[in-house]
A protein has these predicted regions:
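Mid/C-terminal beta-alpha module of Rossmann-like enzyme folds, strongest
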Residues: 2, 202-265, 281, 292-308
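N-terminal Rossmann NAD(P)H-binding glycine-rich loop of SDR-like oxidoreductase domains
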Residues: 2-22
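SDR active-site strand-loop-helix element
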Residues: 5, 30, 67-68, 99-104, ...
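NAD(P)H-binding glycine-rich loop region in Rossmannoid oxidoreductase-like domains
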Residues: 35-95
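Conserved Rossmann-fold NAD(P)-dependent oxidoreductase catalytic core, especially the SDR/UDP-sugar
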Residues: 86-131
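Conserved beta-loop-beta element that borders a ligand/cofactor-binding pocket
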Residues: 104, 136-161
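Glycine-rich "substrate-gating" loop/helix at the edge of Rossmann-like oxidoreductase active sites
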Residues: 127, 155-165, 185-197, 221-223
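A conserved pocket-lining segment of Rossmann-fold NAD(P)-dependent short-chain dehydrogenase/reductase
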Residues: 173-194, 205, 211
């Protein structure tokens, strides 16, 4: 039995598809209100803030995937994320299950250096500090050695379905709504974005590769690294629109935070959009040379095909 904690998000949905397709016939989906991806999926309603519920949800699992998310609310991140993670780790230990942790890059420096698995944590802002503390806790569990632990880390998303990211919200959702795509802060910095189905496929590969445990892995991304201007052009072309976009300058996004709680919550991330974001996934590609990374144009065309 392989179990996904936080089973309703886009990463978890694609992960469930990949696990069922390639790795296991027994799949359990855990969240407060889980929904089946396949008819044969086992649903386990549970609140990960409750340690007893987490233990019950994980019991009998061989591999546990932590893909749980929260709304971009600093208070929720500070008060709930650490508890959810700790309960998930304790439940996995009680079950003797392997633990695969899906991570982001909020703990990294917000500058133009090439990010590798060895880049030291230097979080900017409260959400970055939360994610740094969570990643450090998982590394502690990895070093403890009671259960096998692996970390799969992804940069900013773009993707199909209900993918949630700044890029999806400003570029892709704008095009879906018939508006000009918007890009945050600057359009001339290089971006590394990950196609969400690739992230899920890669996490499944790590979880089912015994030699992957005990390490952190950057999940595989296309190395073309377009600027936001180039990405917006590709997105417009995929949607059959004349290439054009607007830039939301930093002062505009900062001002928006005075009136919008959602805009206020992303202000700590704005420095990363002033710099190139260079995310290196060489380690994964060398270990899994047959893994096919989705090119940006192919991903954008897939999004267009699913759009009404």
């Amino acid at each position: 039995m392989q179990t996904i904690l936080g089973a309703n998000g886009q990463i978890a949905i694609e992960l469930a598809r990949e696990l069922r397709s390639r790795h296991t016939g027994e799949l359990r989906l855990v969240s407060r209100h889980p929904r089946k991806v396949h008819d044969a999926d086992v649903l386990a309603p549970a609140d990960l803030l409750d340690a007893a519920q987490a233990i019950a949800a994980v019991r009998g699992s061989s591999i546990v995937y932590f893909t749980a998310g929260l709304p971009p609310d600093t208070r929720l991140w500070e008060t709930q994320f650490p508890v959810m993670l700790e309960n998930a780790l304790q439940a996995s230990r009680a079950a003797g299950a392997k633990f695969a942790y899906f991570d982001n890059t909020y703990m990294y420096p917000q500058d133009a250096r090439l990010l590798t698995e060895d880049t030291p944590f230097a979080p900017v802002g409260p959400k970055g500090r939360v994610r740094a503390a969570m990643a450090s806790r998982v590394l502690e569990e990895m070093a403890r050695g009671d259960i096998p632990v692996v970390i799969g880390r992804a940069p900013e998303f773009y993707g199909p379905g209900q993918t949630q990211s700044v890029t999806n919200a400003l570029v892709i959702d704008s095009l879906k709504a018939g508006r000009l795509p918007r890009v945050p802060v600057r359009d001339d910095t290089l971006r590394t974005l990950i196609w969400t189905p690739d992230a899920s496929r890669a996490l499944a590969a790590l979880g089912n590769a015994p030699d992957a445990y005990g390490k952190t892995w950057h999940l595989p991304c296309c190395d073309d690294r377009p600027t936001y201007r180039q990405f917006a052009v590709m997105a417009c072309e995929a949607f059959g629109r004349k290439p054009s976009h607007t830039v939301l300058r930093r002062w505009m996004m900062t001002a928006a935070g005075l009136f919008s709680p959602q805009a206020r919550e992303i202000r700590e991330l704005l420095p990363r959009y002033e710099q190139d974001q260079l995310f290196d996934s060489t380690r994964f590609k060398q270990r899994f040379p047959a893994f096919e990374v989705t090119p940006y144009r192919q991903g954008l065309e897939a999004i267009r095909r699913e759009s009404p």
